[in-house]
Amino acid sequence: MNMALLLASSVLAFQGVFSFEDDGSSLILRENDKAVWEFHYALVQPPFPVPAHYERACYFHPLYGLDGEIMTQDFPIDHFHHRGLFWAWPDSLAGEKKIDVWILKNARQRNLSRVEKEDDAERAVLSLVNHWAFDENPDQGIMKEEVEVIVYPAEDSHRAMDFTLTFTNVSDGTITLRGSGTDNKGYGGFCFRPDALRKNFIFTAATGRIEEDALALESPWVDISFPVVKGETALSGLAVFQHPDLPGFPHAGWILRHYGFLGQSWPHTQDHLMNPGDSFTLKYRVVLHRGSCEEADVPSLFQAYMTAQQSE
């Protein structure tokens, strides 16, 4: 084999080949036959003894680390509504009626019939449309979600995934979006529920280690790292980067809980009023990595991300 052919084959082996598998209720993404994540587009029924109203769809679980470890948790005993990697809001209003796709009391996200996917050696792209609907009328959309997820090949120490989430009011009335009003904590937005069986959790932001729980934080990124296997020293983790186009960037709406929760909460504790036809877009990069935040050099990965956005 000549040197050029050897180099080309090495690059392809490093980049990997992406493929999707559709099992009739979820999409499983693989790179070189190694699972990356599973996206649930059909409603997932709760396991016993979780109450039936917690059925949900439109979220990622399991999300896998670079060495095949499961990073996420679904239906955790302490918060039944937490679900892998997801986005949802609790104390929102459709007109004057509460619509809760967070606790899932009277409404939930449903995937519409259009699901597009493409895959090659350089990236995998998942494009889909969901909507929020009340349980009493599941076909009548209130809020439309247009989602694009771009997954890049695993590198030596990390994998990057870009999320673009566009929300449009498709109802006849106003929608008021906000985070949780309970104690004005502001829960709601782009959320990651780590596997709590693997704690303790180490949170790191641009300002350094975050030792206590936080309901707001001045940082454009946050990392959470935790043992690959409970009780052992080897770590893996996940970082969330805010895109510079995020409204209010850098947005302080971070929620960090050491029981096992990382949220980029937007609009956090402020109301966001949407008239019919109004829309907004949230963009994030998710980085899965081996080791701690420091070992993966997450600050440098964030700076490279910012540089790339500025050059576009």
Q: Where are the language model's segments positioned?
A:
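Sec-dependent N-terminal signal peptides
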Residues: M1-A13
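Beta-strand-rich N-terminal accessory domains
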Residues: F14-H81, R178-S180, G291-C293, P299
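Short, hydrophobic/aromatic-enriched beta-strand segments in well-ordered soluble domains
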Residues: D33, L128-N130, F163, N169, ...
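Acidic (Asp/Glu-rich), glycine- and aromatic
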Residues: F39-Q45, P51-H53, A154-I202
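Extended, loop-rich substrate-binding clefts of extracytoplasmic carbohydrate-active enzymes
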Residues: F80-S157
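Beta-strand elements of well-folded, non-transmembrane domains
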Residues: N130-E136, V149-P153, F167-S171, P194-R198, ...
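Active-site/ligand-binding surface loops and adjacent short beta/alpha elements
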Residues: T174-L246
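Beta-strand-rich recognition/accessory modules
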Residues: L238-E312
